Design a protein with these regions (language model features):
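Membrane-proximal helix-turn-helix segments that form the acceptor-binding/catalytic region
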Residues: 103, 131, 144, 160-184, ...
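N-terminal subdomain of nucleotide-sugar transferases
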Residues: 1-61, 106-108, 253
Length: 402
């Protein structure tokens, strides 16, 4: 079967978990004998970058092109809001990306197209796929079809954001652009219900399938003896205010026992973290690191902390943490409570509540040995999120579409 995967970003140009999911699925499908190719974006690099070309040819072929807009998605934070507004309009209605994708699809003639995040690649590309009559499966990863930034902090969707005229107009445009794929996959019940409540995908079948863990599973044990020394907390992800990094740094200031806070990632708030790490030896900043390095940190740290302030879908870092047997302290928001069970594989706290997060960090320190003893149990629980099972489901879904 020839399969096309379309994603606004694709490794090594990744910003979040959606791109990693797309790559893992591509690799697994290829290993099963399917002919897989990718369509994704690249920053502007002269006139030639407007034409799609295969820039990598590993197991899968990767077509990259610049989707003719004011700037590339990666550079959005550098531009003022009025230019971002124009950028969003072009992304929604610009004909160029749609024509490029149409040309590639006509040349390749895939049996099915899997789409992931499309913002920055041309949102109406989805409508083009459906117009061509190709089987179409779309995976939603965040709220970007409802909120341009893809970020909805705490209770925004219950108050002023709910009645925003701009947001309503934006939703109307994205509903038209995304259309109704044959099947829409949501990694969490939260996100599926979020979009259904806002009348997206009226003619699509909605399926909830949690994200897959990486195919590689380390055989290295976390340890069978009781941990000693300062407790080690780990934050992995985008270093942004909406990810709760500021809340976490304030929360650890309230701790009265020895600890280490390891931070790995990159983002617009990285300089404040670097400054904090220079002033406090208990805070260790690793920067943007490889997945293998992340796994090593997860194995060696006592727990992963995910203090997000925004409505998360189904964070990849939780799956990866469970896969190595490490518990998670996380915000009780979005789809996180569907993965983290309070007291079993981690602890849940109210988002943005500094004192509650401090209490959870302290509680974990007291129950440190208890959670280490649960490592194998936590690791085993991650087996239901295996990449093999995930792709098995995808193949069944494709076969069911007439």
């Amino acid at each position: 079967m020839k399969i096309c995967i379309i994603s606004n970003l694709y490794p090594p140009s990744e910003r979040g978990g959606a791109e990693l999911v797309a790559q893992r699925v591509a690799d697994e499908l290829s290993s099963r004998g399917h002919d897989v190719f990718i369509i994704t974006t690249m920053p502007f690099a002269g006139i030639k970058s407007l034409c799609p070309k295969v820039t990598e040819h590993y197991v899968e072929r990767v077509y990259r092109f610049f989707p003719l807009n004011l700037y590339h998605l990666f550079n959005a934070h550098r531009f003022p809001h009025f230019l971002r507004l124009i950028w969003h309009v072009i992304d929604l209605f610009g004909p160029f990306p749609k024509s490029v994708i149409k040309r590639v699809l006509k040349d390749e003639e895939p049996d099915v197209v899997f789409t992931h995040n499309l913002k920055g690649l041309g949102m109406s590309s989805a409508f083009q796929i459906q117009k061509m009559g190709i089987r179409h499966i779309h995976t939603i990863h965040d709220v970007q079809l409802s909120v341009p930034s893809g970020i909805l902090v705490c209770d925004q969707h219950k108050n002023r954001e709910q009645i925003s005229l701009v947001r309503r107009l934006y939703e109307k445009a994205t509903k038209y652009a995304i259309g109704s794929p044959d099947v829409v996959i949501s990694p969490s019940n939260f996100l599926a219900e979020f979009y259904q409540s806002r009348n997206f995908f009226p003619n699509s079948e909605i399926r909830v399938i949690p994200n897959p863990t990486p195919k590689y599973v380390s055989r290295e044990e976390r340890g069978t003896v009781s941990p000693s020394g300062p407790i080690k907390y780990l934050f992995v992800g985008q270093i942004e205010d909406h990810k709760g990094i500021g809340v976490l740094l304030k929360a650890v200031n309230n701790l009265s026992f020895p600890f280490e806070l390891h931070i790995a990632g990159d983002g617009t708030s990285v300089q404040s973290v670097v400054k904090k790490a220079k002033l406090d030896s208990r805070i260790i900043f690793h920067g943007f690191i490889s997945l293998e390095h992340i796994r090593k940190l997860m194995r060696n740290c006592d727990c992963v902390v995910l203090p997000s302030m925004c409505y998360e879908n189904s964070p990849t870092v939780i799956y990866e943490s469970f896969q190595v047997g490490t518990a998670v302290i996380a915000s009780k928001i979005g789809g996180i409570p569907e993965l983290v069970i309070d007291g079993e594989n981690g602890l849940l706290v109210e988002p943005g509540n500094i004192s509650e997060l401090s209490e959870a960090l302290s509680k974990f320190e007291k129950e440190r040995e208890v959670f280490w003893n649960k490592s194998k149990e936590i690791q085993k629980s991650a087996e239901r999120f295996s990449l093999k099972k995930y792709v098995d489901e995808l193949e069944k879904i494709v076969a069911s579409i007439k």
